[in-house]
Amino acid sequence: MRITEKCIEVDVSLYRKKKPVTVVAKLDTGAALCSIDYSLSTLLGVQPHRTAKIRSANGKERRDVVWIDIEFNGIRQTVEATLTIRDGLTYPMLLGFNALGNNRTITDIKNAVYGEEE
């Protein structure tokens, strides 16, 4: 994890079969679910299993939701992620609150990010 002037960046491995694809994601504790670009869902070969109503900076919208296998901070887990077009944005993935619960990560923006030692 890296703290930049504007956000916290996290290296996340996304798995398709056994080969991981690693991306730099933006940690977004205000997002209930992770969010990935459509191009990543195509690369991973995942299909939507439901839709969700999402509130974003662009207003309310419905988005497709997929299951993805991710790993960061040494823990691999399966989480839901919404699909969106992230062209022109810095990060192809937002790491939402749903990915933090199993990861034992504490975020204190004023000071640092702490991961529990195993």
Regions picked out by a protein language model, each given a short descriptive name:
Residues 1-118:
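Pepsin/retropepsin-fold aspartyl endopeptidases
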